[in-house]
């Protein structure tokens, strides 16, 4: 695996590697389907690293697309959710899901919002004010969002200015 798609400004020499094996957890989100169908707002999923947020997001994407029949735009910046290779998703994320992989989140959300007319937008690991700005824009357009953040509990979100703004939205 090379570093060609990543915008490095320094040497792209690799000194260490961390290997994460993504896996599908069928029906992981099935109990949330009725709630998602009736929830009028967007959803923020918080948890510490390794808690299963990305696995939950993957299954929620499939549920919203296939079970609820909604148009979904999936922002998969690091190829973790759909695991696209050669233009094909290796994980089932739904028949009505448009995937943009390998593109910075804020840029990908803007492109998907303007070109794919999503009813839902799914985004993993919000970490930048630019991400939140585009999420607000999507919300103003009537797009429902599901996003994840790293936080062990609600207090962690409230103490971080970036995430505090999400709780107020």
Residue ranges and their predicted role:
Residues 1-40:
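P-loop NTP-binding catalytic core
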Residues 24-28, 99-107, 126:
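A general structural motif
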Residues 37, 64-112:
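P-loop NTPase switch/communication element
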Residues 45:
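Hydrophobic anchor at the beta1->P-loop junction of P-loop NTPases
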Residues 49:
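The conserved Walker
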Residues 52-53:
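Conserved glycine(s) of the Walker
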Residues 56, 60:
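Hydrophobic positions on the alpha1 helix immediately C-terminal to the Walker A/P-loop
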Residues 116-169:
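Conserved P-loop NTPase nucleotide-binding/switch module
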